[in-house]
């Protein structure tokens, strides 16, 4: 395997996990710059993690750029652009740069704009796993540097999957996926808090598990195609669920939002459009919704 000089901008949970495991895999040169590494409440933690892994902590973006050829941004997404602006004056055509923070495509495009005059080849990355995956943490990558970053780091055990040449594609996949994944987390909280108040948490979880046991594409298709026909009934049931939660002192934030969304679908009169027949595909269902939905800010529920 070819040695590379790798630098992390940020050394929190993701950066420290990858840094330690890459060093363990035999990568000789791993360094990091983190604003909190030498001053702040987490300085001791950052220094301890880096010291244990043999990762060099540097004191400036300039030092990191001088020492490393591949730079990985692992700051919070809110700091992606400012971090790119700080290191941009120190990058050259020898550098590859990938930002793997969770952020919108617009933010990742702003990162690329901040680095545009540097000569560095830039990629947008998004993490679709968790730190417990370790070095095999799944990362989607897009943009001009995506394949080069993959070729340099996959031999060391990283899991990087290029998904296209356009900056922002990887982050769009991740952030839109989060609509569902983060929603599931919030819905589980609400469902099981209510079930706990009724003394039925195990039974409700088991019942939901059976419903969700089908392959996910099949489940999604079934819900979307039947949803355009049965939105009214499902909205009413969501309203009942919200009342049941409120009756035991659980605020039904997610359930009321679900009720409102289903009422919104019902108002599009899709049952009439399809003549009461379930559409052939989820794509047909979504196309019908999109064709009838009011413009953003134009009213509707």
Can you describe what each PLM-predicted range is?
Residues 265-301:
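NAD(P)-dependent dehydrogenase/reductase Rossmann-like domain
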